[in-house]
């Protein structure tokens, strides 16, 4: 029994799950921007709370003043439960928080990655650290700000020398949690915070619609530092090669900046034509092209230092600073829609009541269903095994899966009601069957689905060695479900082995449609979402994604069945950076296997870096590899052992 416990118990922490490290005093390498406060102040319930906390209720306190840091998506001021992150403006590896520097070192990225792919690493860190409300912004050379003034007569950037700090204005601040998302702990800390002294200037303006903060000049950019290292190199032969490579990088960097500048000019020209009375000024030329969507804007108002959350850091106590407006979170293209059918939806929040009437059943669900056992917890609710106790219903004494879905925020209301809409519309043997849905209370929905005994594909892949015939069977069944979605311009966007169920009949079914999206109107979107190891390269790089993003995730699932584990499973950060930089290295991963040429070709067509080169679900269903699929009776041989392993893992 002890051996069984050790096998199914908690696994040893990997590099991504190391204990949080104490933050060192390296704040001079970055600039810190605290989240903008809401005008609605909220008092602390716990007097022992830390001076700055962003725990359960999204309430942050600075210097004895408590602010509600919840940011609303809609203009009417309703909040969505989203908490603004703390922004760190950095220009090189040394500007990262100590936790993140150590994380990157533990990931053992190849030499030079932190220089050549630094902006990609920032995008990955922002995604993995989103639950700790940490967000990095790449800022290039400060000279670019002055260059913008010379090249754009309409842009007036305020350059303000900051005043010396009076001792009476200093406020000591405790450290802000700095752990790694899911895999690096949630604590951090001590008093060695990157923000050691916070200044709250006096509020002298009545306009609180925009929030301004101050940022100090960043250090030299990565190309300048690289050039210094090359010049100090004593090896003349390698120095010449490195200088040539550096020159190519500079040309690429210049081309990117010129292209970005042209796009901005075209966008500004279009905005002026559409809204002649508005002239927003963007400073994204000082930021990474991949982070262009953060929509920073320059301000020429000297009162920006008197804004509610204007903060000064130890790095800009004296010298030159400039002000920007705090960035807003990028919205999903379907943020104002609740799905009904492809191309049709309810407007949210205006038609929320109509959506409730359309998607939900009347009555109290507790009169019909009884909770039995907890099964799983996901990003959009908790799933329980339940039993129908109404003898006159269509599901008499039937075991069902009951998903409890919170609707406390606008985001929860839209996403969870949309998931109900998607499942209610779907009708396919490879997709979990929707039964009914109820509103349990003002804070919770109950969705009833068919109960799938057995386990997930993740359980199966980690406990059994799949032969190619069984892999082909699973791949064919998943693709049939995907093909049904894609033919209706619907993408799953969270396809992973944990969202593929195997029931006691050997049937394969897709579950969890919380991130599902209808591409009938817009054909693509720019957003990063899903599970780290399964996210496509176009998502990580901030490029438009569409239906083909599911094909990449499907290819990772197939590779996981072959290897028995995810590629680069020891580090999510490393896996995502490799995917984003076209360095998955499929031939190397397959070199340790005895896979056939057909299977290798099948995987290669799924895991193409360029999404336009990936085969579609319909094309993959015609691939010769799938002709190897075993009959369902042969696949059912693994079910008893799979069911037992799933039961034991739930026990311990």
Curated annotation (Swiss-Prot):
All residue ranges annotated as the Protein kinase domain in the record: 369-626
Residues the record lists as binding ATP: 375-383, 403
Polar residues: compositionally biased ranges: 279-289
Feature: compositional bias, Low complexity: 257-271
One GO term describing the cellular component: cytoplasm
EC number in record: 2.7.11.1
Keyword ATP-binding appears in the UniProt entry: yes
Region listing for Disordered, in residue ranges: 1-47, 163-198, 257-289
Membership in a protein family: Belongs to the protein kinase superfamily. STE Ser/Thr protein kinase family. STE20 subfamily.
Protein name, UniProt field: Probable serine/threonine-protein kinase mkcD
